[in-house]
Amino acid sequence: MLEAPPLLLVAGGVGLALLALRWLATTDLQFFGRAFIVWNEFIMKPIRNLLMGSSKEQRILQHVLQHAVAGDPQSVVAAIDSYSLEKEWAMHVGEKKGQIVDRVLREQQPSVLLELGAYCGYSAVRMARLLLPGARLLTIEFNPDYAAITQRMVEFAGLQDKVTVVLGASQDIIPQLKKKYDVDTLDMVFLDHWKDRYLPDMLLLEECGLLREGTVLLADNVIYPGAPDFLEYVRGNSRFECSHFSSYLEYSKVVDGLEKVVYKGLSGPARP
């Protein structure tokens, strides 16, 4: 049986992609956002991976190693931004929303910061570069390849003394934070993993006694791809004080935003 050459498969894939985009790309912003993600993550990414023999995440790391300055976190952030803007779209928080993250972090000055979802380490490096002496960041990543790239990124930035990369599912690691990682309570949590895990993981943090009065949770992508159950819960519950920062999906014109949630303490049942 004859096998189709890779380029023929690619051409066929692109043809199917264009047909899919004709259906997805309407005037509805949600459909436009969906088309943007489908094109970049489910069409172009596997095509490039096939042709180049490496993953997008590996290419991002190589770009950083070649163009950033070792021990300079800001140059690492800038290199990732330039690659994701000019070469291949990637799901980092990005420069526009990153400035919001910077501002919140500077205001809070956390001693213990938890990140849910490391991906390639962009936000870990971005946040850790602003931490005060003695402060630390734990970042939980489920994908072992992403966790390894994050670890390499953190080490290249010279932040290995501030950042601990934890491999595993958030729902498995969160109950271990107190005993295994010596966490009493968290000053700040950055949520940027699976959007359907935002609400259950926040409630799990509360159940495990990791939230204190004044703990700040900053959730990315609450508009697109969206975390409607999370927003509905925190905005309708007296245990939380919410504020919204409107912005755009990383490296795009798709409307997005971050939600800042301040935990006011347990004044009612922890489950919706």
From Swiss-Prot:
Cofactor(s) the protein needs: Mg(2+)
EC class name: transferase
Binding site for Mg(2+): 192, 220-221
Top-level taxonomic group: Eukaryota
Cofactor note: Binds 1 Mg(2+) ion per subunit.
Residues binding S-adenosyl-L-methionine: 93, 115, 123, 141, 168-171, 192
One Gene Ontology CC term in the entry: axon
Function of the protein: Catalyzes the O-methylation, and thereby the inactivation, of catecholamine neurotransmitters and catechol hormones. Also shortens the biological half-lives of certain neuroactive drugs, like L-DOPA, alpha-methyl DOPA and isoproterenol.
Protein name: Catechol O-methyltransferase
Organism: Bos taurus (Bovine)
